[in-house]
């Protein structure tokens, strides 16, 4: 914090549960009391503002204003913390920008969960940049500045430095993809030694320097997990970001990640094979047509992947499934039953999968209290109240969607976590499982990933590992894949289990089994 106070702009990339909120409060108080700042504006997602900041600030007896309408702007006094959600910022953008301009930009911005503006084309990113890019002091806090690829860091960098001399591009070479043979070619950087320009030209330049786009089938584009001009990017990160892991801040590593590989039962493999090889039979059962043949062709592979992952999560959610309770759900119930006196948390990603697990747990463990949480059924206040109810149960089961506990709703007393349905990156999953791992925690936390080996979940796990390598680079840790495999508890040949994309005899896209033998 001392190092960050010596600069006007910076980012704290501290892992979830490490005290970013307290650090932002300390910096805001110091700036207002000693450096003449009028007020500290805290901007974040609605759940973070309401469940965290709106609770923490009154607990410390600090003066603050929660901006929910225009009248609230008139109540702001010097020395106040000002809370604004990203959605409300978009609605009041013009008025907030005018208010800040009248105070000569003499405020401090604390953007909590700054990866929320990683998409430069989103309304929340545009409104945040419009209102705060010129303010005097800026602090960005996040658990991970990138989720999927390097280019997501560009809007956060632009917000910090406002395209000034602090963000000069020193990359002599830019890269682009040749549309004809899909190869990566290089050329001299026309902006070498100049600040990265604002908005779209700047995002395009940042991407060309560090992560060129590749064109795929149907003209769609993809971003890989590669890094170009890594040394130049590392220099920029070194002066901007202070990174600390949970272990470095708390002095203890209490996380233990375990993989639970499972084999498909015959009935499960049959429905999985049907979706993989005869997707045309069930496509319209689960996905509506857009009315445009070209769009339907573009979406076909994406829809097939989505349905394959749904089969892997809960095969009994498909009408074509003829078996009993799926092995993954039975395994989750058996593991929960073994922890008879433990509170267990289970996080899935979709409502229909959650319903399948809820039905099974009511059948197999009728005496255990079951608490179901989704974003649509539980309000912020109810989720806060659940903390005490779940603790008092002694051995309750918290079954929830991972999105319903993304930030600021903490259950630090839960030690067993099951994740039967993976996210597309570890950043999304860690936002969930770090709700149970806080700097005040003292006991070991066991996190179990339940995966069907030989299914598309193996590919998803490999993609999570590849993206985590990028995230670790952004945190100043240049590691190889073997170390990340160890971190995730992967002790089997994952690469041999990956499914592959190919074409059939008629030239149509097709998903195929990997090197593994399927009985």
Residue ranges and their predicted role:
Residues 5-6, 15-19, 23-28, 32-33, ...:
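Conserved Helicase C-terminal RecA-like lobe
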Residues 83-88, 98, 102, 122-136, ...:
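Inter-lobe coupling linker of SF2 helicases/translocases
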Residues 424-430, 437-518:
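A conserved SF2-helicase RecA2
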Residues 21-23, 36-59, 150-152, 349-352:
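Conserved Walker A/P-loop ATP-binding site and its immediately adjacent core
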Residues 16-17, 135-150:
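Conserved helicase ATPase motor motifs in RecA-like P-loop NTPase domains
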Residues 92-94, 115-127, 149-150:
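Conserved ATPase-coupling elements of RecA-like P-loop NTPase cores
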């Amino acid at each position: 914090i001392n190092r960050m106070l010596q600069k006007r702009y910076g980012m704290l990339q501290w892992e979830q549960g490490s005290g970013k909120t307290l650090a932002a409060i300390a910096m805001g108080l110091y700036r207002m009391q000693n450096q003449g700042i009028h007020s500290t504006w805290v901007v974040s997602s609605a759940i973070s503002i309401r469940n965290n900041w709106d609770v923490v600030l009154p607990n410390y007896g600090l003066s603050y204003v929660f901006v929910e309408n225009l009248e609230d702007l008139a109540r702001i006094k010097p020395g106040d913390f000002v809370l604004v959600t990203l959605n409300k910022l978009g609605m009041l953008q013009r008025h907030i920008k005018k208010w800040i301009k009248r105070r000569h930009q003499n405020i401090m911005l604390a953007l909590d969960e700054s990866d929320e503006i990683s998409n430069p084309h989103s309304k929340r990113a545009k409104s945040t940049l419009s209102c705060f890019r010129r303010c005097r002091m800026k602090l960005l806090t996040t658990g991970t500045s990138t989720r999927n690829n390097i280019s997501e860091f560009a809007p956060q960098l632009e917000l910090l430095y406002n395209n000034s001399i602090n963000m000069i591009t020193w990359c002599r070479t830019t890269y682009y993809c040749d549309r004809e043979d899909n190869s990566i070619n290089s050329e001299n950087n026309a902006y070498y030694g100049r600040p990265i320009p604002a908005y779209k030209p700047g995002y395009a330049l940042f991407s060309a320097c560090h992560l060129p786009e590749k064109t795929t089938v149907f003209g769609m584009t993809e971003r890989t997990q590669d890094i170009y001009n890594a040394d130049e990017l590392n220099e920029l990160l070194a002066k901007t970001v202070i990174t600390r892991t949970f272990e470095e801040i708390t002095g203890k590593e209490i996380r233990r990640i375990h993989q639970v590989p499972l084999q498909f039962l015959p009935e499960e493999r049959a429905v999985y094979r049907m979706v993989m090889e005869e997707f045309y039979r069930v496509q319209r059962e689960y996905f509506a047509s857009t009315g445009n043949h070209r769009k339907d062709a573009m979406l076909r592979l994406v829809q097939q992947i989505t349905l394959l992952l749904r089969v892997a999560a809960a095969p009994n959610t498909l009408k074509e499934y003829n078996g009993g309770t799926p092995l993954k759900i039975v395994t989750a119930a058996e593991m929960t039953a073994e922890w008879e006196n433990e509170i267990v948390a289970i996080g899935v990603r979709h409502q229909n999968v959650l319903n399948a697990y809820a039905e099974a747990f009511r059948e197999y463990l009728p005496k255990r209290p079951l608490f179901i949480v989704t974003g649509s059924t539980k309000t912020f206040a109810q989720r806060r109240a659940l903390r005490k109810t779940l603790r008092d149960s002694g051995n309750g089961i918290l079954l929830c969607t991972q999105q319903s506990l993304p930030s600021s709703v903490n259950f630090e007393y839960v030690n067993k976590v099951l994740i039967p349905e993976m996210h597309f990156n570890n950043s999304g999953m860690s936002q969930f499982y770090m709700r149970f791992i806080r700097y005040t925690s003292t006991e070991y936390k066991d996190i179990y990933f339940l995966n069907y080996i030989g299914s598309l979940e193996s590919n998803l796990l490999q993609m999570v590992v590849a993206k985590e390598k990028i995230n670790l680079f952004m945190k100043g840790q240049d590691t190889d894949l073997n170390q990340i495999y160890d971190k995730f508890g992967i002790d089997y040949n994952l690469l041999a289990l990956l499914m592959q994309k190919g074409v059939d005899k008629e030239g149509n896209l097709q998903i195929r089994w990997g090197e593994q033998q399927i009985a």
